[in-house]
UniProtKB/Swiss-Prot annotation:
<keyword id="KW-0862">Zinc</keyword>
<dbReference type="InterPro" id="IPR023091">
    <property type="entry name" value="MetalPrtase_cat_dom_sf_prd"/>
</dbReference>
<comment type="function">
    <text>Single strand-specific metallo-endoribonuclease involved in late-stage 70S ribosome quality control and in maturation of the 3' terminus of the 16S rRNA.</text>
</comment>
<dbReference type="InterPro" id="IPR002036">
    <property type="entry name" value="YbeY"/>
</dbReference>
<keyword id="KW-0479">Metal-binding</keyword>
<keyword id="KW-0255">Endonuclease</keyword>
<keyword id="KW-0698">rRNA processing</keyword>
<feature type="binding site">
    <location>
        <position position="136"/>
    </location>
    <ligand>
        <name>Zn(2+)</name>
    </ligand>
</feature>
<dbReference type="InterPro" id="IPR020549">
    <property type="entry name" value="YbeY_CS"/>
</dbReference>
<dbReference type="GO" id="GO:0005737">
    <property type="term" value="C:cytoplasm"/>
</dbReference>
<dbReference type="GO" id="GO:0004521">
    <property type="term" value="F:RNA endonuclease activity"/>
</dbReference>
<keyword id="KW-0540">Nuclease</keyword>
<feature type="binding site">
    <location>
        <position position="130"/>
    </location>
    <ligand>
        <name>Zn(2+)</name>
    </ligand>
</feature>
<dbReference type="Pfam" id="PF02130">
    <property type="entry name" value="YbeY"/>
</dbReference>
<keyword id="KW-0690">Ribosome biogenesis</keyword>
<feature type="binding site">
    <location>
        <position position="126"/>
    </location>
    <ligand>
        <name>Zn(2+)</name>
    </ligand>
</feature>
<protein>
    <recommendedName>
        <fullName>Endoribonuclease YbeY</fullName>
        <ecNumber>3.1.-.-</ecNumber>
    </recommendedName>
</protein>
Length: 167
C-alpha cells in the first residue's frame, strides 16, 4: 500500500522505548486506505514529535493561541493541489508539516484511558487528513466527514473509536 513518505524528527522527551517511526508509518498507511489522495509515495510529510514548549511557541506564533495543543498541521498545498500532486508520478511533493506535543498527548491519553501510542496514532491520522485538505473547523458536515475517516483508519489498526461517548 502506498502512503506518504514520512520524515521524522523525534525530541528525546518522547523516549526511545517505542518505535514512533513505525507507529507514524502504520498511521499513514491506514489514512491512505480511507483517503485515497494520501495513497501515494510521491507525497512527503515532515512529522515532528516535540515537547510542549515548542508546540506552544508555534501555536502562539501561527494560530495566536497562547498554549500548547495536541497536534499542529501546516499544509503546503491546497486541497486541489493535493489531488493534483497525488496523480503526479514525478518527484515527491511536500504535503506539509505536522507537530505533536508530548505532554499534551500524554495527558489526553490518560484522560481518555488509552495508551500514548494509541492517542499519538490518532493524532497522526488526524494531522494527515488536515494536510490533505480536510478541516473539521469549517462546519459540522466537514467535522463529521473528517471524524468518520479517522474512525475508519483507526479501525483498520484495531483502535477503538476515539469519539465514542462512554456512559
Amino acid at each position: 500500500m502506498s502512503a506518504p513518505i514520512l520524515e521524522m524528527d523525534i525530541d528525546p522527551v518522547w523516549g526511545d522505548a517505542i518505535d514512533w517511526e513505525d507507529i507514524a508509518s502504520r498511521a499513514a498507511e491506514a489514512a491512505a486506505k480511507v483517503a485515497p489522495e494520501l495513497a501515494h509515495e510521491n507525497l512527503l510529510v515532515s512529522v515532528v514529535l516535540a515537547d510542549d514548549d515548542e508546540v506552544h511557541a508555534l501555536n502562539k506564533q501561527w494560530r495566536a493561541k497562547d498554549k500548547p495543543t495536541n497536534v499542529l498541521s501546516f499544509p503546503m498545498l491546497s486541497r486541489e493541489e493535493v489531488l493534483h500532486a497525488a496523480a503526479d508520478e514525478g518527484a515527491p511533493g511536500m504535503l506539509g508539516d505536522m507537530i505533536l506535543a508530548h505532554g499534551v498527548c500524554t495527558r489526553e491519553a490518560a484522560e481518555k484511558g488509552v495508551s500514548v501510542e494509541t492517542h499519538a496514532t490518532h493524532l497522526v491520522v488526524h494531522g494527515l487528513l488536515h494536510l490533505a485538505g480536510y478541516d473539521h473547523e469549517l462546519g459540522e458536515a466537514e467535522a463529521e466527514e473528517m471524524e468518520n475517516l479517522e474512525r475508519k483508519a483507526l479501525a483498520l489498526m484495531g483502535i477503538a473509536d476515539p469519539y465514542a461517548v462512554e456512559d
